[in-house]
């Protein structure tokens, strides 16, 4: 089928042709015949690089051109910004926006956009706020819909579908995934037509490596002559053959170790590419850690990189872009980042099929996850084939890996929404958002979830009612709901908890701790916010004595193992807001720049939520001070610098401290300065000095005077 045959606006067809899209792939033709451009709901379960995302983008833009809105939901912030770049092709046709944060907002200005890219959680949060523009939504796309089986994100997706059904919106639903074991069941639940295909633009060969040989599933064998450990040999062999390699391993330390080993082997084999030095300089400049930045930049200059959650988003993007441009020949990534790494390579090497889970110990990765990694093999237009290779340590393990992963069936997604913690949050969300006013309403609401669809029993409704009733009683006990017979109402506190997108149990814990505070101090406020299980616990380093004393002076808490972990984590953040050098923090507490960013982002949400809860329960002073502590965590500064970092673009914690120490402490001080004076300060150049002075003068002209 030719693109010109599609039932699309001529302008949209012209953009597709400009992108080099002339003929559709077979799975795309199936999707068109299933009605993806006729408003039909469709579940696309087709191989990586088969063009499903392109169709979803076009359907979203088509809706915009027809005067309707489209929401494009993705599981990760990183994917949201990547998708925004994809939509830039259509910027002459539609306005595209992105919304990933601030759950306590209805984002009423989003109606100004034709297409909005959102994270799952942000979309669910928007549906709880029920902004007026929801009636304009004509298309909802859910990328990576296999996340329905994720214990945390799956219930969010189910809740989104239940809310859309309750609102009665005539919305076209488009689900995308390369890997859903029970696609028919999911499509039936969604009321969508299923398009399922294993067709790929580049043939995929899957096999297992052991003893210097790759044994492929079709019975063929390939000897690998490159020296070194299995993972290194497989990567270097791919590069020697003119390809690129993507290696997945199970820990951050392994990504660094293997990347160094690959770089050394590539040097020995004379395979170091040219042209990556400029990229290495960009990596060094973008990294907030001089130590990690230098370590990574040294590898990048030799055509290799590690890629893990410890790296900042900007650094990860530089690595990904360098790989796509061919400047990097090998990237070694953690298996946990496989979903967010959209990097095709001739050879994908799965070095570890087990990983460590703090709660479960060592566990095997699911077949679904292996398929996600294997799907990256083969660059359309560049590679004649793609290879996905698992590494075995013994002959017996090689046979096991072949049966379990290469020949194995992808697991079906199973719902987790009826598990008590998830049910609790989504019951409150349904009542607080106005989707249910009685137990009967709640039963109806949750009857629309995949969890209900997967309950194969005639007692389904009575089981649902019993589960929901128990959760309602708990929410009443915490003061979030009130019950009058069968009727259920959200209290003002409950509505706010739902709007803040808080786990009710976390909110109840925050309220209890805030009410019990004997005195307010920074360590105690850090401790309160960090009690949410969303925060990873810092396991290394020693808790600051002053932090421990501050917590114990304000709260009656037991000094157990959990307390020690929380006190250590609070100590790490205390060092951050006391402006300790970042590399010192990373080394002392064994955290990385990407970890710190996670803490900061979470604290911005949960710290502000705790401040609002404090005010709602009559603890105004604690609310004010929690807001200040949260702002300090967001910017990593002492309190006296908050005005500077919040007022001036281009001025972070280091430059703000420089300004302050050199006597530029107010907007007036900066506005009176000359460009030469500011430009002479460490970390400032002429261009930034001009910008900072202009910003200060403009703010003063608008009436923002005094201490900042």
Curated annotation (Swiss-Prot):
Any one GO molecular-function label of the UniProt entry = ATP hydrolysis activity
Q: What's a Pfam family in this record?
A: Helicase_C
Limits of the Helicase ATP-binding domain: 33-198
> Which residue windows are coiled coil?
none
The record's section on SUPFAM superfamilies has: P-loop containing nucleoside triphosphate hydrolases, Sec63 N-terminal domain-like, Winged helix' DNA-binding domain
Keyword Ribosomal protein assigned to the entry: answer is no
Main EC class the enzyme belongs to: isomerase
Q: Where does ATP bind?
A: 28, 46-53
Q: Which InterPro entries does the annotation name?
A: DEAD/DEAH_box_helicase_dom, Hel308-like_dom4, Hel308_SKI2-like, Helicase_ATP-bd, Helicase_C-like, Helicase_Hel308, Hlx-hairpin-Hlx_DNA-bd_motif, P-loop_NTPase
Q: Which UniProt keywords apply?
A: ATP-binding, DNA damage, DNA repair, DNA-binding, Helicase, Hydrolase, Isomerase, Nucleotide-binding
Give every Helicase C-terminal domain span. 231-429
Instruction: Please indicate the residue ranges that the annotation assigns to the motif DEAH box.
Output: 143-146
Instruction: Give the signal peptide, or none.
Output: none
Q: Which Gene3D superfamilies match?
A: 1.10.3380.30, 5' to 3' exonuclease, C-terminal subdomain (1.10.150.20), P-loop containing nucleotide triphosphate hydrolases (3.40.50.300)
Q: EC number(s) per UniProt?
A: 5.6.2.4
List GO BP terms, alphabetically.
DNA repair
Disulfides per UniProt:
none
Reactions this protein catalyses: Couples ATP hydrolysis with the unwinding of duplex DNA by translocating in the 3'-5' direction; ATP + H2O = ADP + phosphate + H(+)
Instruction: Write out the function statement from the record.
Output: DNA-dependent ATPase and 3'-5' DNA helicase that may be involved in repair of stalled replication forks.
Q: Which family does it belong to?
A: Belongs to the helicase family. Hel308 subfamily.
Give the quaternary structure.
Monomer.
The protein, known as: ATP-dependent DNA helicase Hel308
**Species name for this entry?**
Pyrobaculum calidifontis (strain DSM 21063 / JCM 11548 / VA1)
**Taxonomically, what lineage is the organism?**
Archaea, Thermoproteota, Thermoprotei, Thermoproteales, Thermoproteaceae
């Amino acid at each position: 089928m030719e693109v010109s045959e599609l039932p699309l606006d001529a302008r949209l067809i012209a953009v597709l042709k400009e992108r080099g899209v002339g003929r559709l792939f077979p799975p795309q033709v199936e999707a068109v015949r299933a009605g993806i451009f006729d408003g039909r709901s469709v579940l696309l379960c087709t191989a990586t690089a088969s063009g499903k995302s392109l169709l979803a983008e076009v359907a979203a833009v088509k809706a915009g051109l027809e005067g309707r809105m489209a929401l494009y939901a993705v599981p990760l912030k990183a994917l949201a910004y990547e998708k925004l770049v994809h939509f830039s092709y259509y910027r002459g046709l539609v306005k595209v926006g992105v919304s990933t944060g601030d759950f306590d907002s209805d984002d009423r200005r989003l109606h100004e956009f034709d297409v909005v890219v959102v994270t799952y959680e942000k979309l669910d949060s928007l549906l709880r706020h029920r902004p007026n523009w929801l009636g304009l939504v004509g298309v909802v796309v859910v990328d990576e819909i296999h996340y329905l089986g994720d214990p945390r994100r799956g219930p969010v997706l189910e809740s989104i579908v239940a809310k859309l059904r309750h609102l009665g919106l005539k919305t076209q639903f488009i689900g995308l995934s390369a890997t859903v074991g029970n696609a028919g069941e999911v499509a039936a639940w969604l009321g969508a037509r299923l398009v399922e295909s294993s067709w790929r633009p580049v043939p995929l060969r899957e096999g297992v490596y052991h003893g210097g040989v790759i044994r492929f599933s079709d019975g063929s064998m390939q000897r690998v002559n490159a020296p070194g450990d299995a993972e290194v040999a497989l990567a270097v062999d791919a590069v020697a053959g003119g390809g690129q390699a993507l290696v997945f391993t199970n820990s951050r330390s392994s990504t660094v170790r293997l990347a160094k080993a690959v770089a050394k082997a590539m040097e020995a084999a004379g395979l170091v590419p040219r042209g990556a030095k400029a990229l290495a300089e960009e990596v060094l400049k973008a990294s907030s850690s001089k130590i990690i930045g230098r370590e990574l930049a040294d590898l990048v200059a030799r055509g290799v990189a590690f890629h893990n959650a410890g790296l900042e988003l900007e650094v990860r993007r530089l690595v990904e872009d360098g790989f796509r441009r061919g400047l990097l020949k090998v990237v070694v990534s953690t298996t946990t980042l496989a979903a967010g790494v959209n990097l095709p390579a001739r050879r994908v090497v799965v070095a570890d099929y087990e990983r460590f889970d703090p709660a479960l110990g060592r566990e095997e990765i699911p077949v679904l996850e292996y398929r996600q990694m294997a799907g990256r093999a083969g660059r359309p237009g560049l590679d004649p084939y793609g290879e996905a290779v698992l590494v075995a340590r013994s002959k017996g393990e090689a046979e096991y890996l072949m049966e379990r992963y290469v020949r194995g069936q992808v697991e079906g997604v199973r719902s987790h929404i009826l598990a008590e913690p998830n049910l609790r949050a989504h019951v409150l969300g349904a009542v607080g958002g106005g989707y249910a006013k009685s137990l009967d309403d709640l039963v109806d609401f949750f009857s629309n979830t995949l969890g209900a669809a997967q309950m194969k029993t005639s007692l389904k409704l009575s089981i649902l009612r019993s589960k929901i009733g128990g959760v309602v009683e708990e929410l009443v006990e915490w003061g979030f709901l009130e019950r009058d017979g069968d009727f259920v109402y959200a209290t003002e506190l409950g509505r706010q908890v739902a709007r803040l997108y808080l786990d009710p149990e976390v909110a109840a814990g925050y309220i209890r701790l805030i009410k019990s505070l004997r005195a307010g101090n920074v360590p105690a406020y850090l401790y309160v916010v960090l009690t949410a299980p969303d925060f990873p616990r810092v396991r290394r380093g020693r808790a600051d004595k002053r932090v421990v004393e501050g917590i114990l002076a304000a709260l009656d808490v037991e000094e157990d193992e959990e307390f020690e972990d929380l006190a250590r984590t609070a100590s790490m953040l205390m060092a951050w807001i006391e402006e300790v050098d970042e590399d010192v923090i990373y080394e002392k507490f064994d955290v990385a720049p990407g970890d710190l960013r996670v803490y900061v982002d979470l604290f911005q949400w949960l710290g502000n939520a705790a401040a609002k809860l404090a005010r709602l329960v009559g603890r105004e002073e604690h609310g004010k001070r929690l807001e200040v502590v949260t702002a300090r965590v967001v910017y990593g500064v002492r309190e006296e610098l908050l005005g500077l970092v919040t007022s001036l673009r281009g001025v972070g914690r280091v430059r703000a401290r420089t300004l302050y120490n050199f006597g530029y402490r107010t907007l007036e001080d900066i506005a009176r300065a000359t460009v030469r004076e500011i430009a002479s300060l460490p970390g400032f150049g002429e261009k930034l000095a001009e910008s900072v002075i202009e910003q200060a003068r403009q703010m003063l002209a608008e009436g923002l005077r005094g201490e900042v």
